[in-house]
Amino acid sequence: MEENLYDEFGNYVGPEVEDDEEEEDEDFLGGLDDDRDERARGDDEAMDVDGEKGADRSIVLHEDKKYYPDAEEVFGDAEALVQMEDTQPLTEPIIAPVRSKNFDLLEKKMPDTTFDFNFLAGMMDKPALIRNICFLGAMHHGKTLFMDQLVMNTHERDWKINKEVRYTDSRQDEQDRGLTIKATPMSLVVQDTKEKSYLFNVMDTPGHTNFQDEVIAGMAVSDGVVLIVDVVVGLTVHIERMLKHALQEKLTVVLVINGLDRLIVELKLPPTDAYHKLRYCIEEVNELLEKLYDTTGAEVESRTYFSPLKGNVLFSSALFRMMFSLESYSCIYADTHPSAKFDTKQLAKCLWGDVYFNADTNKFQKSPPDADQPRSFVQFVLEPIYKVFAHCLGEEKEDLAETLKEIGIYLHKKDYDLDARSLLKIVFSHFFGYGGGLPAFIDMIVEHIPSPKENAAAKTERVYSGDQEGSVATDMKALDRTGYLMVQTVKNYHRPDCNAFDVFGRVMSGTLFRGDRVKILGEAYSLDDDEDMTVREIQNLWIYEGRYRVEVSHVPAGNWVLIGGIENSIKKTATITTASNEEEVEIFRPLRFPGSSVIKVAIEPLQPAELPKMVDGLRKIDKAYPMVKTRVEESGEHVISGTGEIYLDCILHDLRKLYGDLEIKVADPVVEFCETVVETSSLKCFAETPNKKNKLFMVAEPLEKGVGEDIEKGKVRIDWDARRVSDFFTKNYDWDLLAARSIWAFGPDNNGPNVLVDDSLPSEVDKAMLKQSKESLVQGFQWATKEGPLCDEKIRSVKFKIMNAELSDDPVMRGGGQIIPTARRVAYSAFLLATPRLMEPVMFSEIECPADCVAAIYNVLSRRRGHVVRDLPKPGSPMYVVHAYLPAMESFGFETDLRTHTSGQAMCQTMFDHWQLVPGDPLDRSILLRPLEPAPAPHLAREFMLKMRRRKGLSEDVSVHKFFDDPMLLELSRQDAELSGYF
């Protein structure tokens, strides 16, 4: 039967057979057909709805077929970039990681404190309980360690006893260098001996001379200064200069004698010698005060001096965390002998000076009862401290425990296993009570430093440039928190990401609220020119605490504040007032610094494409450092000017790591120069305006010594009335009254060291017409003194006299476009005919070294055109102090050279002091400079000028044809054949 089912070829020819698999296939295919039908129906419906937007039935070529949707269809609003090749360098990741700068040492969370921050904010409304103070001292005199005692006693944390915290050194490079770079404020609630709370706003400042700008900014917002002096080192020139500035600002000063432990451990002085050293240190400071009072012209009634008997002197050892005054030490005796019931204030008066204790009568007397009787300070103050040191350093644990019990000090057993320094810290913290005697410091500040309300009137007179009788100044003098809002800003602090800055300042009157719209007045703002003014909204307000911030809603008058959201409108300092203030508000005076930024370097990015990033970084550098100057030369190079090598080193570090995040190339450092004259112009110079309708005549001559410095220091101001200005010059420099009344301007700005005088005669010049052109003449004069003809450096100590002026009757013909460049050109010609010279900055160097290193210092200085002013021993120590002058051009690497020749025993501090003439004639073309050979002294001026001109992209030599008209050249050739070598 099966044979009938197949043909002869084996093919199946029988009946159809039902197959389950075929049914499944049919079901599957049928389902697909159903889906196609449904999609087709859907497409038909869509076509019906969309009309012309339906599916296109036209034939599509293979190469035009679209197999995948476009990126815009898939990702919507996202931007899609298509690149045909990989242009990203291998060193750069495809997806860059999120970078966080961990340069600042910040608190990860709000620290625990002994006070509540709401309580602190409440105390801001009580100006009588506020003290704004600034720490002042030389480098390594213990300011930051002293600040640590305030921080440790107000912040609850497990502070490591064997480690110095240096809490206000909140930058990583400050910790690495062991050097404070930035002034850091902190606001703390502290208690005095009566447990009364006060709000202390404290500014810890750098001690290095290069960072004096930070100290000046700190003093600008303070009412008093805490002068911290190391008892071994004593006074330094940096302290002298900063103390002079504090007295000029009418700030109250108190004294802290630090380093008491050094007399015992390092110098190993007997107690009697230690007393004499302490007394000498105080007398040295008082002698300096006497000299500064005479210099500043302070009234005799307002002069205060330091004495432990007055309570304005504190003795301290910041390393061992102890401090005391005479009164606080007498309180220790009162607590130790409660049965005696003596007056602590009376006892304190007997603990200083030539006072002795008579054991037989139990009384103090002026004469010693015995020949070897020590003074009361030695017997009752120093000897107990010496004994504590001796027992802690020399006794075994068991004996030391018994000794300490006798004076009421009980320690844990584990404390005796600590090293000697840590053990002494713990012992002294028990010996002097809470905080190692911190209430003694609080008492001194509260008693001697005025509150913001008490000092408001004096502060306003010093910092406000407006009318002192106006309503704005009246509110500031009364510290009226409901009056006009006035805020003085002095510093800018970057945020942790270094992309933005917050502005730090002091509220002088009114109350600053978050969300206020305020007017920001820049340093160039005036009532006549309001261009430097913007309106912004306050986004954030903080109390700045060094390593963390406390946000607040408002800050009343008398307090310090950190402001967020307005930094784009502020370069250095600014004045902030309410936007709705309709009063005529003038600015707070910009900060004035005793030194100058004379060291400069030229920089450029390693990758030229990163130039915009570097320029943005330079803007941030300009905000972060008060004394830095950044500018672009005509050659296109970017120049940074600073006070010294370490100052510039910190700036370049911040530019690379924080603000620019790029690699830069740095040129060799150079210095700023000035141009001056040493004689009067050989003839009356003249220049014609381009339209040949006006002619100006001028001569130049040297300015009297000291005039330029007085103008720069603000002792005389051009905005005074004419009588006041003339009185200054007639009384101080013997100017005749006519010349003093004829002063028109200072240059290159209103505080510049050059003077423009109208010396023309009314019989020769139409004074009314000349006065109409005064503004243009002044602008030309200031332009000329800003960029001198020798090498585009500032002109200094030159008096320019307008001798005559032939002016057109038509005002259009004598407009600013004609007069300004002509005034500049005639000033240049008068300058070049007055024997021009170059001036270079000279640095003052204070060198501390052992006596056997003094000879090596002389040798190092002699090779750098320097000379020693004096060298003298430091009393009570084995050190010598050498004072020397050194040209800034020769100061690069001086400190390294000095330490090399003294085996690291010498330490120096260098700062700008004055300007001096560079030897030689810069216009002497007979001088030939040989490459790779040092130029002799008479050739230095020529060498400096040529190298500066080459660096700035100027022509090789000064072109006289550029500054002299043809008639003037003919006059010169006839007048003096000796000048022919210049043409």
Q: What would you call each of these model-derived segments?
A:
Residues 252, 262-364, 380, 384, ...:
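Canonical P-loop GTPase G-domain recognition
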Residues 86-220, 225, 267, 284:
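P-loop NTPase switch module centered on the Walker A-proximal segment
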Residues 1-130, 135, 179, 185, ...:
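Intrinsically disordered, low-complexity N-terminal segments enriched in charged residues and glycine
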Residues 370-502, 509-512:
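Accessory interdomain/linker segments of ATP-dependent helicases and helicase-like nucleic-acid enzymes
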Residues 275, 297-302, 321, 330-353, ...:
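Accessory interaction regions appended to the cores of large information-processing enzymes
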Residues 142-143, 319-330, 437-445, 452, ...:
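Conserved GTPase G-domain signal focused on the G5
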Residues 197, 205-211, 219-271:
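Conserved Switch II/interswitch segment of TRAFAC-class P-loop GTPases
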Residues 221-224, 249-253, 309-311, 598, ...:
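Short glycine-/polar-rich loops that comprise or flank the Walker A/P-loop
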